[in-house]
Amino acid sequence: MSHPIEFFFDLVSPYSYLASEKIEELAQRNNRELIWKPFLLGGLFKALDAPPAPGLLPYKKPHLFKDLVRLAKFHGIPFNTPSEFPRLTVKPLRALLGLSKDELPEAVHRLYRAYWVEDRDISDSAVLEDLVGVETVEKTGSPEIKKALIEATDEAVNRGLFGAPSFLVGEELFFGHDRMDLLDAHLKGKL
């Protein structure tokens, strides 16, 4: 039995956005189930006692968006540098966890494009309601949904993740948008 691809991401991660635009085709090409796994990247960094948002380090930040613009152009993915980075993604991630498995992929794409293409504030309730619906946003304050995000982040920690995007196939971890070719080769039995 073939393991599914588990795609761990946070909406705040621009590299996860780029990966989200390619992962479905990669999974389909390899006849693998794709499981979307939203989690809180800041919570992961905190649990690992890692510096928050490595991309924001003063010596790295000037290069970050140049790199992203190049990558997006190279892969033909729409991308605009947002006016605010990072944005808080707790509420949007909770909204995603309140959706069904079937609703999740399209909602992820809507939220990513709103942030990384349209420069919309996905942490704003009105914007979020427009993207995923009032009912979904209302659920973000429920104890069950809050607990689900904590559990999703704990799972990322417990399974050895250290950043996003991360891909797990069984126990094989592939970290980063730039490792998707290696993930593809692994799924084809070449690695």
Residue ranges of predicted features:
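C-terminal cap of thioredoxin/glutaredoxin-like
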Residues: H3-E6, S16-R32, E106, R110-L191
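Structural alpha/beta surface segment adjacent to cysteine/selenocysteine redox centers
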Residues: L11, Y15-Y115
